[in-house]
């Protein structure tokens, strides 16, 4: 046999080996996913057995004010069809009806809010407030809430940390100043996970928050109290923050809209330990949660303040001419297998745009999305001005992951199990810096090339709807669908798409390139029109 033939045989042998190894890997992955799917089903069966009988329904809503959009309420106050006091009182009454079931609102200012409303009504009645004032204060007289981890002067500001028990804010976060200057009235602050870092809302100071669609289910985190109260009709306007899906996870699980804007347009000052000096590297953002898509842009205009012109929120959008792309499954092996009701949710949206768009939606296959969790972990390690191990002690010392974990599982302590998970995660090695930076840029460039300035991506929200309380401990990576947009700093809107057969919300994410928030919101409005959007978890009369 000649040397040339020998080399050829060796190459063919290597090729066959590579093919065989690839086949084995594919089969092992299929076996893993098949097994994982049925383990997830078993988890639900077991949790359901112990929890389904404990479900408590949300009370019927009898006041039509509760169902109106924040924009509509503001217009009616302006036209004197409603008084601010009537509106605020309606939501105070509703919170008192639903919060005993939800445990969403953890600190209130009802009487002060009603007095704020009466003053507004007096100013409107005597002509002190003019039309120009309404333009500068688009939400005059409309109530809102925000999460307890953001500073609202005079309100609880513990971040769910035991060492901060009883702490109250002495100032307003920058975004709170903006929404107050727009005329909105704060009713209180809502529950969060400890230090905001978990996909369920639970902490040692205020306990766990329940889902209004099924009180035994998760509301998401970290803006879980906001989404729960909003969906139950407890508030018309909600503001959350988002470093890893914290607006969108709760919005998904509670069937409302949530928008994470283009990054670095909204000050972070007053959000937990942040000062506003974190710079452009931070993934932290602030965004609205609403029951009606029409509220997203008006609230966003307020939050971005002087940067409003960068977002083109007043530009008309013809959704038929938007270039649509979609991804059905990000193929991240750490995430639970994608269930059929979630697959059909995104395909319903795709089908709708196939019917109305000038060009059919294109399915994308972008490998980098499967690295979402690893990339987010890397960029979280680069967040400036924060240190989880110190912050969790209120910066009075530094947590010891090993000692505090042992203490938690033996004698208990001041940390939640989710915080212990975060401790253990800190012990794991961070992704390689060179790889993470390169992969982030590669993914960003691929998506920017597809989206341009007139494209959106329809993207999954989760492998399945809201799971039972604490089941997230067995599925700790299921938030990965959300975090990739924090890594890339793209704007993204969580859109409700109705309920599944269990009566739980389903939905999708709508993503655009930076500064194209108006496209996300336009598509959200179209999907709301086509599929109904928010579905109340209570009877109405």
Q: Language-model segments: which ranges?
A:
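Short, well-ordered beta-strand elements within core beta-sheets of diverse protein domains
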Residues: 72-79, 145, 163-167, 284-291, ...
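Flexible, acidic active-site loops/lids enriched in D/E/S/T/G that coordinate Mg2+ and/or position polar
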Residues: 110, 114-139, 165, 169, ...
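Short glycine/serine-rich loop segments
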Residues: 171-300, 491-498, 504-507
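Conserved hydrophobic/aromatic pocket- or pore-lining residues that grip, position, or stack substrates
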Residues: 91, 113, 141, 147, ...
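Short glycine-rich, flexible loops that bind phosphorylated cofactors or substrates
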Residues: 153-154, 194-195, 333, 466
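Enzymes and membrane/adaptor proteins characterized by extended Gly/Ser/Thr/Asp/Glu-rich
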Residues: 136-175
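Amidase signature
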Residues: 1-134, 302-483, 487, 515, ...
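Short glycine-enriched, charge-decorated loop/helix-capping segments at active-site entrances
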Residues: 159-165, 471-475, 510
